[in-house]
Amino acid sequence: MNIKSLTKIALAMLVGLAAATAQAAQTYLPFTLASNDAGTTAAKLDGTKKALTDNGFEVAGEYSPYAGAYVIVVTNDELKKAAASHSRGGYVAAQRISLTEMDGKVQVSYTNPVYMSYAYRVNSKLAQTSAALKKALGYVQDFGPSEGMDAEDLNEYHYTFGMEYFDEPLELASKGSHDAMVAEIEKNLGAKRSGAAQVYKIDIPGTSQTLFGVSMKAPNEGKKYMDETFIMGEIDFKPLRSTAHLPYEILVKGKEAEALHARFRIAVNFPDLAMMGDNSFMNIMPTPDAIRDVLTSVAGGKSQDDDF
């Protein structure tokens, strides 16, 4: 083999190595900032919803979790198809968009579909959804922690030793059928049991999965650790707000109801949240159990012992 051939082989190997390294290095952040312009949520809300529906999205629900914040939840055919790809894929059916007032401007942001797809082990690029969101709302930057995670890290994500993975959900309750479980949740959310209320409901075609969005407001100070306003006040403190973390979910699969454990659900959206100190997990230590108790009550299940 002559020098020229060896040079070509070496060059090809280097190009292949560079391509593999670039692919392996692709990382994702949990949120996307679409715009940050002067104005108010009231002035921008209708236009935001119209832009979403004009680009193929169906508004599944909306609400204001607290003053200065508004969340719109949408879905589309691509998201529902991805949700149907495995028995617990329903979580990816809901795409959350937030409008947050900060310093005279409104941050319009949304959950990064690709990030959530890998976190929920659906593993779809959701190209149509990502493109439609950018077309409808715009694009400034992705945001969240200082460093993103790649697909493998997201598939196997947990915050630290002893913290739950995606496949370690809360088993809330079981009824005689899927319809009975759905009806129980709808009844209890309608009654605002334990301070919870329904934000949206999405049925996943071709499956026995139904996803509920659940808002949570503490009925009194003693229940503050389940309250969205309290929780977000502790964990969502950066200049770019992550309001689209909300709301939490209950997934009905077959005749059973489950929810992502809050130690996963919070951490996957705030992976750089400190364990101790100001604005840390320590400040919301009772929150995972408090959320579990609310969602269990909504599903008609029995309360469990605290994890800590």
Q: For each of these PLM feature ranges, what is it?
A:
Residues A10-A18:
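Bacterial N-terminal signal peptides
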Residues V108-M149:
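Hydrophobic alpha-helical segments and helix pairs
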